[in-house]
Amino acid sequence: LLLDVYTDNESLYINPLKVWNRYSPNMFLPHKYMEENGSFLPLKGGYEISRFYTLVDALTNTSENQNLDSWERFITDTRRTYRREGIFTPAVEDIISHTMMSNDEKILSLLKTYFEPDDYFLVYKRMIGTGCIGGKACGMLLARKIIQKDNPEAFAHMEPHDSYYLGSDVFYTYIVHNKFWRLHIHQKTKQGYFKLAPQLEQAFLSGSFPEAIRLQFIRMLEYFGQRPIIVRSSSLQEDAFGNAFAGKYESVFCINTGTMDERLTELENAVRTVYASTMNTSALEYRR
């Protein structure tokens, strides 16, 4: 039995990671120590589980050993400067918000009003790959910040947010990695827009993810344990002002049980399905 132990000085939690020669439906759920009877009970309520993973996120050092690229170094240096000196300039905020959040000027204006530096750092911390998190994810986070600042009484009753974001660059990396970039470009032409969409859809469904992305998927699955996961689209167009894009792309529910290999396969298939749904007729007609 291999497990992690966490405490916030009020409650004690264990989170099983590996178990040998035994099985139960709740085995990989986080458990809370019940002092009154000396037992550990699995966390099942959404509120309790969200609180637990907020604690894990605060205690876990995510600065793993890795070769940082220029963007990662920029974020790391920016965060260090802010922590030590309290400096977070408008120019730096412009770079981060344009790169990670949105290019919509109205959204960017709201971000400057409601987002704090730590909000940007938390988004970065929860990203798989790089690029933009898309309109739906950005809008959801912004809505929470508006409620937090303008209606703190209501915000106090909201569950902690607990999502990961697949950066827009991963979409293009997936295309290049699976060698159908040329098909992707030809599909964008007037002649190939509808004609090549079914072929491109199949390419999305049959591709594989780069190993670096798969490793980040595994880390995310380790973090969530065997909690159900919903993979949702959040394209650059979705939920922008005047461009709702509602219901055009797929959302996929992952049961997220079984071995790590089974859970990883389920997650990868869900992401493939969402990517492929960009080629459905309804979405194509909406984007014209």
Predicted regions: what they are:
Residues 1-288:
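Nucleotide/phosphate-binding sheet-loop regions of phosphoryl- and nucleotidyl-transfer enzymes
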